[in-house]
Amino acid sequence: MTTLPAKVLLLGSGELGKEVAIAAQRLGCHVIACDRYADAPAMQVADEAEVLAMTDREALLEVVRRHKPTVVIPEIEALAVNALAELEDEGLTVIPTARATAVTMNRDRIRDLAAGELALRTARFAYAASAEELHAEAPALGWPVVVKPVMSSSGKGQSVVDGPEGLNEAWEAAMANARGTSTHVIVEEFLRFDLEITLLTIRQRDGSTLFCPPIGHEQARGDYQCSWQPAALSDKQLSEAQAMARTVTDNLGGAGLFGVEFFLCGDEVIFSELSPRPHDTGLVTLISQNLNEFELHLRAVLGLPIPAIRCADAAASRVILADKHGSRVTYSGMEEALQESETSVFLFGKRDARPGRRMGVALARGEHQAEARAKADRSAAAVHLHIED
């Protein structure tokens, strides 16, 4: 039996955390939003806010112990995961588990789990702890290769390298954009995939698993640009993706929504990455599903029923990005952006801008995917950012 209201403490307060906070408050929860900077998006709608360095173990422990939440919901990768394990040992519920957060915060740990222990199909890969090691490991994978920090946010620090001459620059980019204490990179073969998908996987308290219809998406510089749902998969591809997602989420345990990413290469389904939380490509569910990914996350976390997940025939999202630095942002063009039926625009409330920063998202439904994607693209293009220093 779930007793409400619960007290929810969010570690990370960006646009995804903001939607988690809204979903929690609609269930009567008291929300404490934490992040490393003030006035983060989720803080704007939360009951309370805390600013702290979340990689600081003592600071994180102090905040959580002072608030005594029902659940702690991590929403970012850069956390003092040893503190989460300590809190879990004290009887606090960490979503989905402290181990899941620790394993998935670094690409090497989740890749070793998936490719090694669980024997899931992945791209060929190697690790390098220096530029010299990168030069030694990359050629065996064939050119081009993809170089990534083992820990980063929103695809930052990723490079596609066509030959040995680009490896030093790729190493520097990875180190400059690495989060936490990351000191090495993962280098992967470049997959010529047909489609990249996210399978939102909901693990409930009783261990049962539900799936949302697959979400197709496109990235640039490792960061999501647009997504659409449902993505077209064969029955065989969908069955394989669901089986792999169930295998890895069962291993990680706990309750909540996971964003499990795959590459589709011909008939093959290849595991890519996993986030133990709502996924940026899943923003499309704000318009596509009867229960969006944030509502599904909260229902699973709190042990509430999920009777059915229904999806529109065609829906799409397109991000709205900043193109320069500034500390004051205003928007125009919303009249044009919202003039078509079944469209919506979410502005995230970020006060500062920088090139490539995600400031909002346009959403649309259509009779078919081409129409939905075109509507989302037009809506996003109509929004103009005015950025001042």
Swiss-Prot record:
Annotated keywords: ATP-binding, Ligase, Magnesium, Metal-binding, Nucleotide-binding, Purine biosynthesis
Binding site for N(1)-(5-phospho-beta-D-ribosyl)glycinamide: E15, L16, E75, D280, K350, R357, R358
Domain ATP-grasp, chain residue ranges per copy: 112-302
Any one GO molecular-function label of the UniProt entry: phosphoribosylglycinamide formyltransferase 2 activity
Protein residues bound to Mg(2+): E261, E273
Pfam family for this entry, one: RS_preATP-grasp-like
Pathway, per record: Purine metabolism; IMP biosynthesis via de novo pathway; N(2)-formyl-N(1)-(5-phospho-D-ribosyl)glycinamide from N(1)-(5-phospho-D-ribosyl)glycinamide (formate route): step 1/1
One of the GO biological process terms: 'de novo' IMP biosynthetic process
Matching InterPro entries: ATP-grasp, ATP-grasp_carboxylate-amine, ATP_grasp_subdomain_1, PreATP-grasp_dom_sf, PurT, PurT/PurK_preATP-grasp, PurT_C, Rudment_hybrid_motif
Binding site for ATP: R107, K148, S153, S154, G155, K156, G157, Q158, E188, E189, F190, L191, E196
Listed EC numbers: 6.3.1.21
Keyword Nucleotide-binding: yes
Catalyzed chemical reaction(s): N(1)-(5-phospho-beta-D-ribosyl)glycinamide + formate + ATP = N(2)-formyl-N(1)-(5-phospho-beta-D-ribosyl)glycinamide + ADP + phosphate + H(+)
GO cellular component, as recorded: cytosol
Known role: Involved in the de novo purine biosynthesis. Catalyzes the transfer of formate to 5-phospho-ribosyl-glycinamide (GAR), producing 5-phospho-ribosyl-N-formylglycinamide (FGAR). Formate is provided by PurU via hydrolysis of 10-formyl-tetrahydrofolate.
Family note: Belongs to the PurK/PurT family.
Oligomeric and partner information: Homodimer.
Name of this chain's protein: Formate-dependent phosphoribosylglycinamide formyltransferase
Gene that this polypeptide is encoded by: purT
